[in-house]
């Protein structure tokens, strides 16, 4: 295993939800084509509960898990936000503190 360093090649995981599989696949295809993410995992069937404008909402969504680097995260977030149908999409960045050396090397090589 490799300890990730605090650098531009450090890996991060970006979480984003989409309203349906078609939207999630379109967003994933866009960020992969632009080499802003190395991998997108789409998990349909997520249920999100939240308050929006004072009302409790419940939505069935697709959870997107995107793998990228610190140096690509801002461009990835901007791309997702500009192409996302939600007014305020879920965009969360989680640091990767450990990972398999071969996987992290592949991740870095897969990005622009």
UniProtKB/Swiss-Prot annotation:
Names of the cofactor(s): Cu cation
Pfam families documented for this protein: CutA1
Disulfide links within the chain: none
Keyword terms, alphabetized: Copper, Cytoplasm, Metal-binding
Major localisation: cytoplasm
Residues binding Cu cation, per UniProt: 16, 83-84
Gene Ontology biological process terms from the UniProt entry: response to copper ion
Subcellular location: Cytoplasm
Annotated GO MF terms: copper ion binding; metal ion binding
SUPFAM superfamilies, sorted: GlnB-like (SSF54913)
Highest taxon of source: Bacteria
InterPro entries for this protein: CutA_Enterobact, Ion_tolerance_CutA, N-reg_PII-like_a/b, N-reg_PII/ATP_PRibTrfase_C
Subunit structure: Homotrimer.
HAMAP family xref list: CutA (MF_01160)
Protein task: Involved in resistance toward heavy metals.
Family, per entry: Belongs to the CutA family.
Protein name per Swiss-Prot or TrEMBL: Divalent-cation tolerance protein CutA
Species name: Escherichia coli (strain K12)
Lineage, broadest ranks: Bacteria, Pseudomonadati, Pseudomonadota, Gammaproteobacteria, Enterobacterales
């Amino acid at each position: 295993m490799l300890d990730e360093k605090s650098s531009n090649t450090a890996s991060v995981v970006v979480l984003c939800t989409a309203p349906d599989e078609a939207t999630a696949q379109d967003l994933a295809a866009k960020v992969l084509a632009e080499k802003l993410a190395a991998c997108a995992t789409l998990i349909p069937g997520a249920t999100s509960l939240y308050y929006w404008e004072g009302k409790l909402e419940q939505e069935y969504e697709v959870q997107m898990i995107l793998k990228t680097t610190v140096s690509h995260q801002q461009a990835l977030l901007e791309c997702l936000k500009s192409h996302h149908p939600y007014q305020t999409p879920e965009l969360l960045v989680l640091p990767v503190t450990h990972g398999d050396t071969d996987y992290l090397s592949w991740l870095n090589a897969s990005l622009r």
